[in-house]
Amino acid sequence: MNNHPMPATDAASASDIISRIGSLTRMLRDSLRELGLDQAIAQAAEAIPDARDRLDYVVHMTAQAAERALNCVEAAQPRQNELESSAKALKIRWDEWFANPIELSDARSLVTDTREYLAVVPQHTSFTNAQLLEIMMAQDFQDLTGQVIKRMMDVVQEIEKQLLMVLMENIPDIPSKPQKPTDSLLNGPQMDKNVAGVIASQDQVDDLLDSLGF
């Protein structure tokens, strides 16, 4: 282990860096407090875990609905396959009978099988209808998750607004950029097109961040 003392110049340099970082941190906190942004940023930071929980909820509800729908399809498909195969077999037998009428006993057997098939059709269709209803009910997650996603969008927009306020209030003057003839930012970044000096669109947000070098 190296026990040699740190050179005085290195120690002084490290102490100076720490002191400057502390001063900058204090200045930033004081500025935020004076601007009234400290509470707003704290609220935005607190919203992040809540947003994560809401996203987890959306993922859970979506997966649950998908699983319910798949289970219904898997339950109904064998019955539909059975109806299809039985109907095809009966059609072949009836076509053969019409092409070459068979003896009465064989015809009676064909009629009996057809009646049995017709008797089970309502059972299968009723079961399938129940599965279709379950699939439809599984889609109710969209109503709930839609509300959650809308709340998430509000949170993200609020965080973005608070961070932009910090940037706009605590940065030096930004050199003006050449404007295109069709540029809508003739009066600088705006957040409300009805109020001067406020950002109105995502393009203007991107323009501000780009001008800051972010």
Swiss-Prot record:
InterPro entries: Chemotax_Pase_CheZ, CheZ_family_phosphatases
NCBIfam families: PRK11166.1
Subcellular localization, as worded in the UniProt entry: Cytoplasm
Molecular function terms, GO-annotated: phosphoprotein phosphatase activity
Keyword Cytoplasm appears in the UniProt entry: yes
Keywords in alphabetical order: Chemotaxis, Cytoplasm, Flagellar rotation, Hydrolase, Protein phosphatase
Protein name: Protein phosphatase CheZ
Function as written in the Swiss-Prot or TrEMBL entry: Plays an important role in bacterial chemotaxis signal transduction pathway by accelerating the dephosphorylation of phosphorylated CheY (CheY-P).
Biological-process GO terms, alphabetical: archaeal or bacterial-type flagellum-dependent cell motility; chemotaxis; regulation of chemotaxis
Source organism superkingdom: Bacteria
Lineage per the UniProt record: Bacteria, Pseudomonadati, Pseudomonadota, Gammaproteobacteria, Enterobacterales
Entries under SUPFAM superfamilies matching the protein: Chemotaxis phosphatase CheZ (SSF75708)
Residues with site note (Enhances dephosphorylation of CheY-P): Q147
Subunit relationships: Homodimer.
Family indicated by similarity: Belongs to the CheZ family.
Keyword hit for Cytoplasm: yes
Enzyme Commission code: 3.1.3.-
GO cellular component: bacterial-type flagellum; cytoplasm
Principal subcellular localization: cytoplasm
